[in-house]
Amino acid sequence: APLGDHQPIARPRSLITGKRMQKIEWGPNWEEILGSEFAKRRADKNFDQVQADIYGEYENTFMMYLPRLCEHCLNPTCVASCPSGAIYKREEDGIVLIDQDKCRGWRMCISGCPYKKIYYNWKSGKSEKCIFCYPRIESGQPTICSETCVGRIRYLGVLLYDADKIKEAASTPNEKDLYKAQLDVFLDPNDPAVIEQALKDGVPMSVIEAAQKSPVYKLAMDWQLALPLHPEYRTLPMVWYVPPLSPIQNAAEAGKVGMDGLIPDVDSLRIPVKYLANMLTAGDEVPVKLALKRLLAMRSYTLRQRVDKVG
């Protein structure tokens, strides 16, 4: 490269105007990625009823990864917001897709999706989103994001649900009851009555057997480790998250850490429980604490197994 005044890097160029951008001052999720001062970030709804000012101090700042994709909701708002009727939810697997032939670029779906997971393609004039790798799903393969994840953090599985209960669950008056209401929508694949009805409705036995072996059912229903992202949106999201364990936040007196028996107290974790509850259970701390305690107990047990050779 010839000598110049700048480092040989690719400077940002606007896809809208085509001009070079000297300084990027705002972008998607700008506040969430620490792109601005804390005064703006603290407006995040997840900080409701959290002593937010404490986390504005650098030494108390916490980070967590939240890999988000389309939630493929049971009650998708994007479907209802599209004037062209281009968005639909497939009956056979629940995947939400955009018909590119029907899409007219109204962009109502972008503002209609509370998870911000629909994007407008300025070149094609169409809206686009995660398609859950449906061609791979149809051929029995996992999604690309699941297969290529080095940490193996993603789990896929069949989950049976009662479609007749969706409206009732989404209409639950108290936001904190929405998580439990969605659990009631899911069906036990080992229940003989569920199996009988599923076969009558044309569900193949192979799908029922897959549901019985589904890791998703175990994480969400049996162990109750996975929780829905912002259930207060009432979309009944179908991509759930296991809350993250975080380093222990030292108590006021240096060297003292809250303990609950043999495992650390979940209230001593660096990421506030209330913050996670606002994100995953509409502010209800009980399911979050239960999941964190189970994760801490399993970590403690596994540590003793591998290090102390106990059990």
Predicted regions and their residues:
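Non-ligating segments of multi-cofactor redox enzymes
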Residues: 1-311
